[in-house]
Amino acid sequence: MAASLPSTLSFSSAPDEIQHPQIKFSEWKFKLFRVRSFEKAPEEAQKEKDSSEGKPYLEQSPVVPEKPGGQNSILTQRALKLHPKFSKKFHADGKSSDKAVHQARLRHFCRICGNRFKSDGHSRRYPVHGPVDAKTQSLFRKKEKRVTSWPDLIARIFRIDVKADVDSIHPTEFCHDCWSIMHRKFSSSHSQVYFPRKVTVEWHPHTPSCDICFTAHRGLKRKRHQPNVQLSKKLKTVLNHARRDRRKRTQARVSSKEVLKKISNCSKIHLSTKLLAVDFPAHFVKSISCQICEHILADPVETSCKHLFCRICILRCLKVMGSYCPSCRYPCFPTDLESPVKSFLNILNSLMVKCPAQDCNEEVSLEKYNHHVSSHKESKETLVHINKGGRPRQHLLSLTRRAQKHRLRELKIQVKEFADKEEGGDVKAVCLTLFLLALRARNEHRQADELEAIMQGRGSGLQPAVCLAIRVNTFLSCSQYHKMYRTVKAITGRQIFQPLHALRNAEKVLLPGYHPFEWQPPLKNVSSRTDVGIIDGLSGLASSVDEYPVDTIAKRFRYDSALVSALMDMEEDILEGMRSQDLDDYLNGPFTVVVKESCDGMGDVSEKHGSGPAVPEKAVRFSFTVMRITIEHGSQNVKVFEEPKPNSELCCKPLCLMLADESDHETLTAILSPLIAEREAMKSSELTLEMGGIPRTFKFIFRGTGYDEKLVREVEGLEASGSVYICTLCDTTRLEASQNLVFHSITRSHAENLQRYEVWRSNPYHESVEELRDRVKGVSAKPFIETVPSIDALHCDIGNAAEFYKIFQLEIGEVYKHPNASKEERKRWQATLDKHLRKRMNLKPIMRMNGNFARKLMTQETVDAVCELIPSEERHEALRELMDLYLKMKPVWRSSCPAKECPESLCQYSFNSQRFAELLSTKFKYRYEGKITNYFHKTLAHVPEIIERDGSIGAWASEGNESGNKLFRRFRKMNARQSKCYEMEDVLKHHWLYTSKYLQKFMNAHNALKSSGFTMNSKETLGDPLGIEDSLESQDSMEF
């Protein structure tokens, strides 16, 4: 058996004794057990070591150099003698032996091109299914791409799928030539990328007439002939013919260059490289010259194969010769042409060239060459056009319009005749095209590109929507924007920004009242019109002479129209959310939209301007936020949108603005009652709205959670916050809450408050005032807005911080020892605390607690600073433990999703709240004996139940609306008008546009570029994003 096998097959090429599916395992096994007869002699090992050291260094990928055929044949025969059981086995199974021999021979061929590997000892191979080598990895790293294995690259370049290869049919390696093709494809070199085969090589399973095995057998049996003299003569003749053909091809190549030069025909408009002022090296000159006309590059463009040409030359050649690169014949189309990198253009424009004009020896940069030559032409023209005996002939541009018409009369007639004959009378198009060609001929391509953009209707300026985003986000009124527009246009001479009328057209699409919609069933007591924009706040209210007079200015959107506009503004986000959940775009719902409602009063919004009725110097704002959108899919609801920043002013959309006092119950009900009526009607109806070209159905869930305690009591008909019924969630009294600090549950609801109001109004049991008050648990007015029994996280922080501020003062005065302190002493404690906090914590004293002060006050550093003013160590420990417990509990009601953001604090909340209550009733008994604050009660008793019901407290807070209050002040100052009525319209419209997600995307794109370092001044920012608890300012907004 050993004699019958060809001796040219090496040990690694699987001879007879290793005709086994696990060939490599056999090799590894022999090395592992170090069979003595297989071990090489020391001389052989040394020779191999020397030869391997002498070989050139290859990449660190699995490159397999081929060894000469006869090197391991003796080794093979020895192995055959040592392992007779292998030979017996393969004698018995001849078919498997043939397949194994076929598989061994396959290893001598390239998988991609099918060529046989060279047997010179230096042939490099690469495993088809192996990792990418280091050189290729570094190349892709420069290209900012990531590739780890060969199959993806082979499929991308050669369109060959090697992932399904079988070792008995396909070769497992490819050659260095194919590797070079892949490397050149992705490198920036100018070398030609050429694959020698047009058809993919097909590999078939082994058959008796197999091409690979058949050619191998024939190759072994071929005899060598004696050299023939006549044959050598024929060979010489063939070589001569080959030389002659080579010379012809060279001549053809030269002649093709001449043809390309004739096609480009640019010798009169492009500069020769001989005009260069410096004698540069030949390679540099070649790099800055066009590869068609061999002139200096004029308006250079780069092809996808990284060759540089003049724009005119390459476009002419592509038109005449076809869509391929003249240098490397790689497919190339006019749309593939791109401008080279700026650094190359800077080098090109800085080259100094000699002026070819006579009597001018100036050397000018290529960038200023056109201007320099045009000065020569102008001076020449002024010398030519002189009337002898008359006054000098003036230049065309210096003439009056009448004189220009007179001089160009004949040309105008000719142009008009041409336009009527060829272009359907479009004189403007003919003149603009002539101007465009003149600019191109003088290499003034920047102006030509701008003109071409204007001719195509694109314009060189910004889109109206981008200009609107800039105006809204930079807080410019219409008049201020118009001044900026005129100034920029006058200075630059170009219309970069769009005029105001274009912005107003863009506004219409984004404001409520633009999109048609329908309700099924129709909304009760609400008009079916859809083109309703800003309306008066009192519209929809049936007024009579005997009613309470309403002295207010109020502007609002209709609630359903505003919701439609908000949904259409989020159209892209909704459709993208459906795609991300693998849902079809054509699904029409029903979608369920969860809306957070917020309302808040503002004090002191007085202005020193404006006419109209005398209205209160306070304001009330009602707004909403789309929190979540789900779609019914099968038996479950799939979430397609969730607001990532539910407490940002960027998503809190204004619905109603009024100049009124929130404590004025009559005015508040008069303005908000129509709005609430629309809301109640929408609860039992479905909206049909066309989105993405398909009518879709929406249902709405309204959750009134963005109210502070004062306003909750106002709209739910409860007594004021000083009442003995201290909680808006349960019926407990202040005394009961102080005795039982933790164990309470939510019992109040809007429906129950309405029933209790009827009992309060009618007194069916004829009880006394005290008995009746105890029966209705503090309900004293008719509830008119449904709110969700919850806690507002922001006001909870502010209320608790105010209480800690009071505790600090009492601890400084040691009230636990001396409870009966005078007012003067208490004021002195407060002054001492304010002075110390200002010195140590840089906290300036304020008249009223706000979110920013509360955040800074509630820290361990503040407690350490306060402890410096308290002599007792025992009180230090009590204060520190109280603050530590509070800081552990705070994240639970502040975070948007406590189960994800702070699961440990959520689990420990009940324990921490009980310990906190224990401290209040023991160490701080002097303050909390028989009483407790409203927010301490809510914090200790109701937080876990609300989290279990809603999943979050912080996400449903009123921070976005509070931040919107600051925006209201800013918009009002910005949109100052003589009429307060129009002023409120401007504020409402501007605030709505400020919350548009469509406009925010333009600003987010700018911010992304800015953070990447593309802007001029990356250090200059408008401020870090601040939450409402930080400063209640609007600086965390879109930035421009």
Swiss-Prot record:
The reported result of mutating W893A is:
Capable of nicking but defective for hairpinning
Which intervals carry biased composition (Basic and acidic residues)?
Answer: 39-53
Which tissues and organs express this gene's product? Answer: Maturing lymphoid cells and central nervous system.
Q: What is the effect of changing D792N?
A: Impaired cleavage
The principal location of this protein is nucleus
Which residue ranges hold the DNA-binding region?
Answer: 389-456
- Zinc finger spans (RING-type)? 290-329
Q: In the UniProt annotation, what is the result of changing N443A?
A: Impairs DNA-binding
- Cofactors demanded by this protein: Mg(2+); Mn(2+)
Q: Which InterPro entries match?
A: RAG1, RAG1_imp-bd, RAG1_Znf, RAG_nonamer-bd_dom, Znf_C2H2_sf, Znf_C3HC4_RING-type, Znf_RING, Znf_RING/FYVE/PHD
Binding residue positions for Zn(2+) 3? C305, H307, C325, C328
Keyword terms: Chromatin regulator, DNA recombination, DNA-binding, Endonuclease, Hydrolase, Isopeptide bond, Metal-binding, Multifunctional enzyme, Nuclease, Nucleus, Transferase, Ubl conjugation, Ubl conjugation pathway, Zinc, Zinc-finger
**What GO cellular-component annotations does this UniProt entry give?**
nucleoplasm; nucleus
Question: Phenotype upon knockout?
Answer: Mice display a severe combined immunodeficiency phenotype. The have a small lymphoid organs that do not contain mature B and T-lymphocytes. The arrest of B- and T-cell differentiation occurs at an early stage and correlates with the inability to perform V(D)J recombination. The frequency of homologous immunoglobulin pairing is much lower. No obvious neuroanatomical or behavioral abnormalities have been observed.
* Result after altering K973A: Moderately defective with 56% of activity
SMART domains, A to Z: RING
Record's protein name:
V(D)J recombination-activating protein 1
Taxonomy-wise, where does this protein's organism fall, top ranks first?
A: Eukaryota, Metazoa, Chordata, Craniata, Vertebrata
